[in-house]
């Protein structure tokens, strides 16, 4: 029997096994597993970096919130020498004055030079407040700023018909009346006219009254002085303090 097979008892038979149908599936599964593992290894550093970034951002936000809380807490218990923001200045604290008329002493009138009026600064409706002072016909400005300046002067006379005045030879009776608010500055040699008002009295009959009101805003400097000049001091109506007055206040 052994001889028919051509094999000796000392030899080992070798049999080649052919692969069966469908035996390539294990290889395909192994390739998919390797691809999935590769993707995981590639994505793992990205996921780790993203996690680290989110963690650091959260810690940073918590740190900033802690710093803000400490700053607010420090301000709450800050010492009194630190800067404190003062409230807006109230109008009642600003310099202001209102002067009323007093009886005037006639003075000699020079050409192109109008006499200045005297004022009451304490009695009746008159006052000076918050470092605004009155002295020797002048209002003294205590601090620089924008001021509203005003004055009303009421004139009165007995007759002002220009033709009759000229025919009678009475040159002391005016054809017009003038009021000027003047500023005097130590650094400037000449007075500055801030406001001027003029009215004709030729068309007015006997026993006439003429008020002239002036008012406007001006930028003034500390130390400036204000006064009111008139063309004829003898015609100023001083009978009532609400007819002739002068004032200024810081805006």
Swiss-Prot record:
Specifically expressed in endothelial cells. Detected in monocytes, placenta, lung, liver, kidney, skeletal muscle, pancreas, spleen, prostate, small intestine and colon. CDD domains: TNF. The chain crosses the membrane at residues 36-56. Residues 57-251 are extracellular. One of its GO terms (biological process) is immune response. The record marks 187, 190 as: Important for binding TNFRSF6B. The record marks 71-72 as: Cleavage. GO terms for molecular function: cytokine activity; signaling receptor binding; tumor necrosis factor receptor binding. Residues 95-251 form the THD domain. Residues 1-35 are cytoplasmic. Receptor for TNFRSF25 and TNFRSF6B. Mediates activation of NF-kappa-B. Inhibits vascular endothelial growth and angiogenesis (in vitro). Promotes activation of caspases and apoptosis. This is Tumor necrosis factor ligand superfamily member 15. It comes from Homo sapiens (Human). The lineage of its organism: Eukaryota, Metazoa, Chordata, Craniata, Vertebrata. The gene is TNFSF15.
